[in-house]
């Protein structure tokens, strides 16, 4: 293919053109995909903020028939911690220090529901084979937290095996409620409650309002569009020649 442009000739090779078109379209696709991800994050941020500002729901007085109505809402509950079972979520970092999130089953008063409560962060300690120092709360208490799905975990480098550190203290690589229910023989509700910082009976809780991260995706989108533009310029420059040099 030859296209005359004044005293210049644009004459790209077929194989070069094919590769250029493929990667150009790929970069454009990835750019728009990142913009779509940014929009999703923006929508979630708006949803989260709205839910977080709504009135606290008392789980003792409200039947959980539709979990989507409770998701990311602040909730309160009166009941007892089942302290004989402590779940440690491994590989959690706070201020650059390795540690665990401590989850404890919580039986809601006058209800069959038992929730895993994320009570916050504790350091691992000097010996990973020993349980960290834990607090034990006896008797009936009232807690406040955020109603949410079990936390997502990235790619695991090892299987999610249950590691017993001592009687009643088990370490997991991820929170999979069905697996924890099987291990503890407790019929757990398939959602968790993350204890609010102002609520008692917890550990270190540096929870932060979720950042939507939309600006990160927008930045990535600009990068992909920049790659597409750069590819187009390189393709054009490398395939244009003066008349008589073709």
Predicted regions: what is each one?
Residues 65:
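Phosphate-centric recognition/catalysis
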Residues 1-62, 73-246:
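Surface-exposed, charge/polar-rich loops and edge strands
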């Amino acid at each position: 293919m030859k296209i005359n442009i004044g005293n210049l000739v644009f004459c790209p090779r077929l194989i070069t053109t094919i590769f250029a078109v493929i990667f150009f379209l790929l970069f454009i696709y990835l750019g728009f995909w990142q913009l779509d991800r940014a929009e999703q994050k923006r929508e979630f941020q708006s949803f989260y903020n709205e839910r977080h500002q709504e009135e606290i729901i008392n789980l003792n007085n409200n039947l959980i028939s539709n979990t989507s109505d409770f998701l990311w809402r602040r909730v309160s509950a009166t009941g007892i911690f089942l302290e004989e079972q402590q779940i440690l979520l491994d590989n959690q970092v706070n201020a650059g220090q390795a540690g665990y999130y401590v989850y404890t089953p919580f039986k809601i008063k006058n209800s069959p529901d038992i929730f895993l409560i994320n009570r916050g962060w504790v350091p691992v300690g000097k010996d990973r084979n020993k349980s960290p120092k834990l607090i034990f709360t006896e008797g009936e208490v009232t807690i406040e937290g955020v109603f949410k799905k079990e936390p997502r975990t990235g790619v695991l480098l090892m299987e999610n095996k249950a590691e017993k550190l001592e009687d009643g203290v088990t370490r997991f690589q991820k929170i999979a409620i069905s697996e924890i229910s099987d291990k503890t023989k407790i019929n757990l509700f398939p959602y968790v409650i993350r204890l609010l910082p102002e609520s008692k009976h917890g550990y270190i809780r540096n929870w932060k309002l979720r950042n939507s991260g939309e600006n990160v995706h927008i930045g990535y989108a600009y990068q992909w569009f920049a790659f597409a533009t750069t590819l187009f310029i390189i393709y054009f420059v490398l395939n244009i020649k003066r008349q008589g040099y073709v």
